[in-house]
Amino acid sequence: MTKVSSLGYPRLGENREWKKLIEAYWAGKVSKNDLFAGAKELRLDFLKKQLNAGLDLIPVGDFSLYDHILDLSVQFNIIPKRFAKEPIDIDLYFAIARGNKENVASSMKKWFNTNYHYIVPEWSKQRPKLNNNRLLDLYLEAREVVGDKAKPVITGPITYVALSTGVEDFTAAVKSLLPLYKQVFTELVKAGASYIQVDEPIFVTDEGKDYLQAAKAVYAYFAKEVPDAKFIFQTYFEGLIDSQVLSQLPVDAFGLDFVYGLEENLEAIKTGAFKGKEIFAGVIDGRNIWSSDFVKTSALLETIEEQSAALTIQPSCSLLHVPVTTKNETDLDPVLRNGLAFADEKLTEVKRLAEHLDGREDPAYDLHIAHFDALQAADFRNVKLEDLSRVATKRPSDFAKRRDIQQEKLHLPLLPTTTIGSFPQSREIRRTRLAWKRGDISDAEYKQFIQAEIERWIRIQEDLDLDVLVHGEFERVDMVEFFGQKLAGFTTTKFGWVQSYGSRAVKPPIIYGDVQHLEPITVEETVYAQSLTDRPVKGMLTGPITITNWSFERTDIPRDQLFNQIGLAIKDEIKLLENAGIAIIQVDEAALREGLPLRKSKQKAYLDDAVHAFHIATSSVKDETQIHTHMCYSKFDEIIDAIRALDADVISIETSRSHGDIIESFETAVYPLGIGLGVYDIHSPRVPTKEEVVANIERPLRQLSPTQFWVNPDCGLKTRQEPETIAALKVLVAATKEVRQKLGN
């Protein structure tokens, strides 16, 4: 019989119970005991759901109260030096992730090319030790519910160290962890663990080539020291970087991604690289929400089965990246809904595929195929769109000329101050929006409320003496979902939440058909805000690449076509804003770097397509219209040429948590356009000191001209509280004025 498994399950819960529990603890509304009890209740519920889905191996250790990499850091005593004197408890754990009054938070980076963020481990000569065997505790807890189906899951030592910062000697760092992993594994085996899943996704990246010898040594050590353990060497998000070497590791099974790494991994299977090994085949897309093509997938599984000692079917990666279930999405078009598969439905899919492979007939298998075919044939996927050959893809003049024209119009001071776009969304805002959605208040009442918030924050910004203002985005729940509600080809869900970082959950829209601009999206609120002040107010849009990367995108057409469709829609909205007198328009490409393929050989094509779509969106404006863009946490050195090629008049970049790493990208490369490198971290409630912000302004000015530098927070301020937001912006403005004075002298 073919087995079925999973790599990980969503933490949030069907109604975001996980998020609400953690935030209640942060707010002091529940005790530590309540937090731990609530977390256990959720864990056990998730285990039972997977047991009832018919899984043969159920992941344990994927659950976290913030981030699974942070869990390892605290477990292995890789605690940042600035927190070293604090007791090792849950409050320290959250402080490392979020910061506190005394110390800044650790860096946060994207988990490979997903929209999930992990807390970067900081090495600073700590002595690794096992503070607790958390995985053993969770395994013993799980055995009470699922018995011997419990499968411990842990990120492997090579990936963990590769994702760290401050590592002076990679080999020494890995070696220092091996006795700790050995103890964890030994205790798990003694407790009855059959399989142990060790995640090593670094080996699907180009960087993984540098660690092949380390992999040989590490897994030889585990095989010798824990001989009774059955290890699954698990990778995802791409194909193995070197299957010839890695397939020879002394492990029992290999978990491979046959969705995003299909070409390389299938070739390795066909050539017999994994002959005699168990294969855990990731054939269900764990990162997107479309139902699987059972016809193609069943044929693929037959090929894999022929070349493996034993086959287990599973999703391509952890289901952390998709919502929990479609069962509550009753408002969706039936053709669309029947073509979707969230986490629970994906578990059903792996079970049905296994039963079909074993020769068991099931009418549900054939019904699944019928639903899949109906979606592919739907009319909304075959719309005639604007001819791209008639669309401008280059600004009329170069940046130097545009800058002079824009400055003559805007009269901005040296080091202009601004924010990224959103302001705090209070409980009152959320409550009023919900009342409007339920029909408890009228459209007119809701509009009046939103306008009152806009006016209040315009006055706050004027009082703070910011130079370029924003309307605050109070009408938006999410920067991508908002546009998904307004464009043809998109739909939104009621409960389609996924974790982005910590307790931050997002509800990505679904791009199910061809995309078109239907009506003004942002014009009314932006024009109203501009009518209240003589200072420029930015129009706030989300760019085509970010909309795509932060949505559940359709996969039946090439990505560049989808980029271009959305670029055309954003172009139409930009033109409406420009015609309405808005002089500065920000087109956020927060997720440009996030979508970058993990392999360098695939990156140029993606970046070329991304730049082209941005040009489609922004190149039809006049020289006097200033185009801004914004980007989130990224390794920018590898995409600096693409950033320059966007030809945005000003780019703002999230930098403060990088502790200087991102700034170095712009210190070593000539960047001629306007730029704002975030001067304080908005992901932490901590208010920066003026001295910190002054330093964060002055450091990039060693390389960048003051005439091109803008001063702004790291990112939007929607998730912050109003008092801390105003306090931090006061510091930002005061620091900017101090630096201006120094420059003037």
UniProtKB/Swiss-Prot annotation:
Keywords: Amino-acid biosynthesis, Metal-binding, Methionine biosynthesis, Methyltransferase, Repeat, Transferase, Zinc. 5-methyltetrahydropteroyltri-L-glutamate binds at residues 19, 115, 478, 501, 504-505, 550. GO terms for biological process: 'de novo' L-methionine biosynthetic process; methylation. The gene is metE. The active site is at residue 683. Catalyzes the transfer of a methyl group from 5-methyltetrahydrofolate to homocysteine resulting in methionine formation. L-methionine binds at residues 420-422, 473, 588. This is 5-methyltetrahydropteroyltriglutamate--homocysteine methyltransferase. It comes from the Bacteria. It catalyses: 5-methyltetrahydropteroyltri-L-glutamate + L-homocysteine = tetrahydropteroyltri-L-glutamate + L-methionine. One of its GO terms (molecular function) is zinc ion binding. Its cofactor is Zn(2+). CDD domains: CIMS_C_terminal_like (cd03311), CIMS_N_terminal_like (cd03312). Gene3D superfamilies: 3.20.20.210. L-homocysteine binds at residues 420-422, 473, 588. HAMAP family: Meth_synth. Optimum pH is between 6-8. Outside of this pH range, the enzyme activity decreases rapidly. At pH 4.6, the enzyme is only 7% as active as it is at pH 7.5.
